[in-house]
Amino acid sequence: MRSQKRGNNRPIPVVAAAFVVLLLAAATAGCTGTERQQDGRVVIAVTIPPEQEFVERVGGDHVRAILLVPQGADPHTYEPPPGVLADVAEAEMYAAVGSGIEFELAWKDKIAALNPGMLVVNCSRGVDLIATGEDGRAGTDPHTWTSPRNAKVMVENICEGLIEVDPENAGDYRRNADAYLEELDTLDANIGDLLAGSGVTTIMVDHSSWAYLTRDYGLTEIAIEDEGKEPSPQRLEHLITQAKEERIRVIFASPEHSTRSAEVIADEIGGSVVMVSPLEKDYLTNTRYVASAFAGSNRP
């Protein structure tokens, strides 16, 4: 499971010099991620807040999670400060989303170089990825965690990784994972019933963050952004027409992105903008809220 898959190492000069200093310091100090914390906890690096919840629910008191992309930041563009990178040198495991999220394409190999002994877990291993294409390049939708069915796969991968780095506590990790998986099963069933009975078939969103959730529960997602960019005037007109034809009354936007186009469309259709984030740490509560918002989006 020790992953050495290479990503897109495009240079990010703002922190490049600091990264080199940290890399040299880690090598000099012999940091390999194998030293346990003084309190006995296993240090686990994670990319996004939902993964932090997964790790903490499975790991319990045995782990300390280091969050690389903080709440409110955009993992497509975020650059970690040197202090966070220094913390990674203490980690025994990195729970990477593993789905092509831009932060990891830019930083995963650099993070692994800081800590060669660290186990890198692809949390999306086993997920049926959604293919995308930008500027003629094939890719995958990175937002795997937004569907509870995928979250269950990610929790299993995290559990396996924790057992590998800390076999002494394997029983606790398995029990914790099973308990959390039961909660995810309940969430999955509740969302399925909620959306099936809502009459909603299509949602419009500012950024294509919810394709896995909409796929799993029989909805269609229309994204306002065009290949990650604000829509052209022509596309905006098309989206307004489409929203009217689909009788869409709510445009969903995320706090990590601009709401300008969502507000324009909402004004034109006499609707409203509702904020939903795919990056809240409280995964169960947030996903339940998002599904409820989707289910009520066609009401006057």
Where are these regions (language model features)?
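Extracytoplasmic metal-acquisition and chelation regions
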Residues: 2, 30-300
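Secretory targeting signatures
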Residues: 1-35
